[in-house]
Amino acid sequence: MPETKPDSSSVRSLPAAAASRSMVDSFGRRIEYLRISVTDKCNLRCVYCMPVEGLPWLKRDEILDYEEIARVVRVMAKMGLRRLRITGGEPLVRRDLSSLIRMLSAIDGIENIALSTNAVLLEDQAEELKAAGVDRVNISLDSLRADRADTIARRPGTLDKVLRGLAAAEAVGFEPIKINVVLMRDSNDDEIADFAAITRERPWHIRFIEIMPTGSNTDLSADSFISCNEALERVRELGDLKPVQGPLGNGPATYYRFDGAPGTIGVITPMSHNFCDRCNRMRLTADGQLRPCLFGSIQTDLRSALRQGEDIRPLVEETLRIKPERHWLVQGSTEGSGGLIALSQTGG
């Protein structure tokens, strides 16, 4: 499988010896991307992610400390890991996150560190995170209307805080900025055109994401599902869209652009057109479970091995070996899921 040449503008220098290493699963997919959940806690209660009453939080001693996370990344970087994404819950609620970023950015072989956030706390942390080594940010924003944003997030004042976080991200030079919009019929689908129009004015990547049945949201997912194909049909009413050639990141989005627009429109289709054949990632949960797939029950306990001083490389290799070919979710059904848990508990 040919290796994609990274964008030199956002990738740290990589020694030749490190560049030759790679992790390849049983289906020939190169795994070079790890999503790291640093906390299961969140300061919002988004309807598609977490029940209104919250969830039982992990105890402090159940969560990996920063040195334990760095140990996992050091081992996996020697095996071919190249890119990291810091997630939660909401990662910015974890104290002194920038110290972890500094540790991870110093690890040989790591090319890029991204952050997924709801941006509520980003205004005060953007500059420090940029200096520590975060290269880019993805920001969740499901409505451009203040009352509706509050309804979806179940917290007051959400939109204003997110927009201030966005402004701070731009001011410190995060590029590109990606905005994730979870599509929900009869909730925010009437804003599809409004979000798309932003790309004609701003160099942002607006990404429409199909809602997935996870945790307690299976009924919502079934009732609210709208495909990205339908979203694109609505966007095309604004003008012609052209596919964007080449990768614009580490993930599964397919991108389009209006003629002359500085920004792009992306679609992420886990339900209508799964992208498992090009999956390049694994997930490390806040409590130290290495998950080869977002869906399903397969996970490997790295925390116990770390705390007993054991070599975790064999565990990583075994998890890589048993990574499934695809998830088996069908819209409106949880059959084959192996027991879904909330996105806040897996890092999405």
Spans of features found by a protein language model:
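Radical SAM enzyme core and accessory elements
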Residues: 1-24, 273-348
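Conserved alpha-helical substructure of the radical SAM core
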Residues: 2-111
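Radical SAM enzyme [4Fe-4S]-AdoMet core and its adjacent flexible, acidic
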Residues: 3-7, 14-16, 142, 147, ...
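Glycine-centered loop/turn positions within well-structured domains
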Residues: 44, 146-147, 274, 300
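Secreted/processed peptides and extracellular or luminal domains of membrane proteins
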Residues: 48, 52-55, 228, 282-285
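Short glycine/proline- and charge-enriched loop/turn segments
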Residues: 52-57, 147, 215, 299
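Radical SAM/AdoMet-radical enzyme domain recognition
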Residues: 63-86, 93-209
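Short capping micro-motif at the N-terminus of alpha-helices
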Residues: 265-267, 292-293
